[in-house]
């Protein structure tokens, strides 16, 4: 400060950098003149951190240096135009209240340099004329000091990074292995691993059944369809003798042959008296080829018993080698291979059953199961009785009960 009472700048930045063994703070009350505001480009740049409020280029009258003003310093200052920033403050003086010297390490395009960090200041209204100054970081002594500081910084960084003990290194390796194992378990849980097939192999029967697409396939061996010559002659002679007699018969049930052959069946319905033959007899039904011989459908029951229960023996014609599919259809349609006719001798050879215990020639039973006598001939009712029957009204319950009794008797007769 001069004798006229005006504020005067004195050089102190270079001496602070070169004289400080440890980068200490300058004395309180030092003056700096603002050369450029934060928006004015300069030869170098100070670090830009979140706490940075403004970056200025300041001078002590001899050397210039970068000055970083923190955000907290701007907020706590009494500067009235702080909302407008440092634009237009060139030539004004900064009164430093809290300041420190820092080193900027070279990174990206920013060179290494010394700079000042201002934590508290006061902007004076006094303006100083512009004077040509040199950059403090361009001085040779300052460059030498900067290199020494950078070497010390690098050595401290290397020693701090190389200070891991063996136990710390093992802990790092263990944590890395645990992390890797967790990643492997997570990857396995996300994958669907398919191991070797342990299922039992399919049999030929299951394989052929799956290839049949759900259709039932039946196979009959050719040996089962062959009839020995002796049996063939007996059956042929029996059939020819029965045909000569002109006897027509139809069995209600046919037992399965021991050979298990699958042949066409010829069935006919028989009536009890010749008078009802033409009206109640149904045409013969031809059965289709199947693995097992099926029993013909029992004829419907009339008011009087009309079914003939016969013991029959099959009459078979000689079988030739198995025809083709279209030939087998024509054979079934043209000539049946098996006819059921009455044979008393054949009935004696087969095991006796309840149906075969009846006589070969059907005779009307004399008594009911309850030992009451059958009555086949009835007198003509009188006219008065006929009129009474017509005028009688039966209740629905009684009609249903009678119908149930009739149906039960018909089912029992059919089963026999």
UniProtKB/Swiss-Prot annotation:
Residues 234-306 are annotated as: Disordered. The modification Phosphoserine is found at residues 25, 313, 317. Gene3D superfamilies: 2.40.50.960. GO terms for molecular function: DNA polymerase binding; protein-containing complex binding; telomerase inhibitor activity; telomeric DNA binding. A motif (PWI) lies at residues 11-13. Its main location: nucleus. Keywords: Chromosome, DNA-binding, Isopeptide bond, Nucleus, Phosphoprotein, Telomere, Ubl conjugation. There is a cross-link at residue 345 (Glycyl lysine isopeptide (Lys-Gly) (interchain with G-Cter in SUMO2)). It is linked to Defects in Acd are the cause of adrenocortical dysplasia (ACD). ACD is a spontaneous autosomal recessive mouse mutant resulting from spontaneous splicing mutation of acd. ACD mice are characterized by developmental defects in organs derived from the urogenital ridge, reduced survival, poor growth, skin hyperpigmentation and adrenal insufficiency. Forty percent of the mutants died within 24 hours. Analysis of 14.5 dpc to 17.5 dpc embryos revealed reduced formation of caudal structure as well as limb defects. Adrenocortical dysplasia mouse was initially reported as a model of human congenital adrenal hypoplasia (AHC). This is Adrenocortical dysplasia protein. The gene is Acd.
């Amino acid at each position: 400060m001069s004798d006229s009472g005006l504020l005067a700048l004195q050089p102190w930045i270079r001496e602070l950098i070169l004289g400080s063994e440890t980068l200490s703070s300058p004395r309180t009350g030092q003056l700096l003149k603002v050369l450029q505001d934060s928006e004015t480009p300069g030869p170098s740049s100070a670090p830009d951190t979140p706490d940075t409020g403004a970056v200025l280029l300041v001078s002590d009258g001899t050397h210039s240096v970068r000055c970083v003003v923190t955000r907290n310093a701007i907020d706590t200052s009494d500067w009235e135009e702080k909302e407008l920033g440092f634009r237009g403050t060139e030539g004004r003086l900064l009164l430093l209240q809290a300041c420190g010297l820092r080193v900027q390490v070279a990174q990206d395009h920013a060179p290494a340099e010394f700079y000042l960090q201002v934590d508290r200041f006061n902007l004076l209204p006094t303006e100083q004329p512009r004077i040509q100054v040199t950059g403090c970081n361009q001085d040779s002594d300052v460059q030498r000091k900067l290199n020494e500081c950078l070497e010390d910084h690098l050595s401290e960084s290397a020693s701090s990074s190389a200070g891991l003990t063996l136990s710390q290194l093992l802990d790092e390796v263990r944590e890395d292995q645990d992390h890797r194992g967790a990643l492997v378990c997570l990857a396995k849980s996300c994958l669907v691993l398919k191991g070797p097939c342990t299922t039992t192999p399919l049999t030929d029967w299951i394989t052929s059944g799956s290839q049949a697409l759900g259709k039932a396939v039946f196979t009959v061996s050719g040996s089962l369809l062959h009839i020995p010559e002796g049996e063939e002659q007996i059956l042929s002679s029996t059939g020819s003798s029965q045909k000569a007699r002109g006897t027509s018969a139809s069995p209600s049930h046919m037992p399965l042959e021991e050979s298990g052959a699958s042949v066409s069946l010829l069935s006919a319905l028989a009536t009890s008296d010749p008078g009802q033959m033409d009206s109640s007899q149904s045409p013969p039904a031809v059965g289709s080829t199947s693995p097992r011989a099926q029993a013909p459908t029992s004829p419907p029951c009339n008011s009087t018993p009309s079914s003939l229960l016969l013991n029959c023996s099959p009459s078979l014609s000689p079988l030739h080698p198995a025809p083709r599919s279209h030939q087998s259809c024509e054979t079934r349609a043209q000539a049946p291979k098996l006819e059921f006719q009455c044979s008393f001798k054949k009935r004696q050879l087969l095991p006796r059953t309840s149906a075969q215990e009846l006589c070969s020639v059907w005779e009307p039973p004399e008594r009911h199961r309850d030992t009451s006598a059958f009555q086949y001939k009835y007198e003509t009712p009188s006219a008065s009785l006929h009129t009474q029957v017509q005028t009688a009204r039966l209740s629905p319950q009684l009609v249903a009960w009678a119908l149930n009794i009739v149906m039960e008797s018909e089912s029992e007769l059919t089963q026999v």
